């Protein structure tokens, strides 16, 4: 049993460190060989589910690095499962009531594995403007991991189906069910890697910018990459170099390419992290 405290600080280029929303976070942690539990304001890196960018965009991971609520995890010899609740906002006259339930699991059998990702986002109204939007996204998938037999750092291919169920109870009153296939391939050797994600299907974010009054919910409702608004294809190619990978430090330099079937975009990323360890303020066994 332990209680952890920390401080999350963000500084944008050209801005002073304390001009952005920074927060003190703390959480309770229970740790056993197979089961872990967290409660409080929890860093997202504690999640063990590898949620695709359709669920969490780079921007969400960067600008909202903590979840507020509960995280439960079980890890066995052949797989894992986790469940969490992230309470984003309590209802007021100006703020919506919002919370996210999420889960992920995976089981391995030899070189093959099967798993799922699941989120249910409750996006309600304010005291002055009622209404609720339900946003459910599920991703069952299967994969083949050949890294060990090929003596590679990473070598895998994965195929799955992204299925959404969305209902604006007040303004629509019925579910829309966009979906599509997603295929991923990942290869890494000598700290150089390529990770490609290909999606073909419907617009997974029909209410992001909608042709009706009151339905433009944007990133407040959708946490995934906005490229999934495509009604054609979306391909994300990341080429990266990871020269430093230790328990203390990690450095990754990436060139990320986006193509939505019409236009191409380019993104550059440099991520450097230092793990200072977990200093326990309170400990009970």
Regions flagged by a language model, labelled:
Residues 25, 76-88, 94, 100-109, ...:
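Exposed, low-structure sequence patches enriched in small/polar residues
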Residues 2-88, 197-199, 203:
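Outer membrane beta-barrel
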Residues 50, 93-96:
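Short secondary-structure transition/capping segments
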């Amino acid at each position: 049993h332990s209680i952890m405290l920390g401080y999350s600080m963000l500084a944008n280029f050209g801005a002073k460190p304390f001009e952005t929303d920074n927060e003190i976070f703390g959480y309770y942690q229970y740790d056993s060989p197979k089961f872990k539990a967290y409660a409080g304001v929890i860093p997202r890196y504690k999640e063990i589910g590898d949620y695709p960018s359709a669920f969490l965009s780079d921007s969400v991971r960067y600008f909202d690095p903590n979840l507020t609520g509960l995280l439960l995890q079980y890890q066995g010899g052949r797989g894992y499962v986790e469940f969490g609740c992230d309470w984003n906002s309590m209802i007021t006259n100006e703020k919506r009531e919002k919370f996210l339930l999420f889960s992920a699991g995976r089981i391995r059998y030899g070189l093959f594995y099967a798993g799922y990702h699941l989120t249910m986002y409750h996006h309600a109204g304010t005291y002055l403007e009622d209404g609720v939007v339900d946003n459910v996204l599920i991703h069952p998938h299967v994969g083949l991991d050949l890294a060990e037999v090929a003596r590679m750092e990473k070598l895998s291919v994965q195929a799955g189906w992204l299925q959404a169920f969305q209902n604006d109870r007040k303004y629509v009153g019925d579910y829309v069910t966009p979906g599509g296939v997603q295929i991923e391939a990942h290869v890494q050797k000598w700290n150089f890697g390529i990770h490609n994600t290909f999606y073909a299907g419907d617009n997974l974010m029909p209410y992001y910018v909608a042709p009706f009054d009151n339905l433009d919910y944007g990133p407040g409702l959708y946490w995934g990459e906005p490229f999934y608004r495509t009604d054609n294809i979306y391909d994300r190619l990341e080429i990266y170099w990871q020269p430093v990978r230790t328990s203390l430090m990690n450095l990754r330099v990436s060139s990320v390419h986006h193509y939505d079937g019409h236009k191409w975009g380019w993104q550059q990323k440099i991520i450097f992290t230092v793990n200072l360890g977990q200093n326990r303020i309170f400990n009970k066994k």
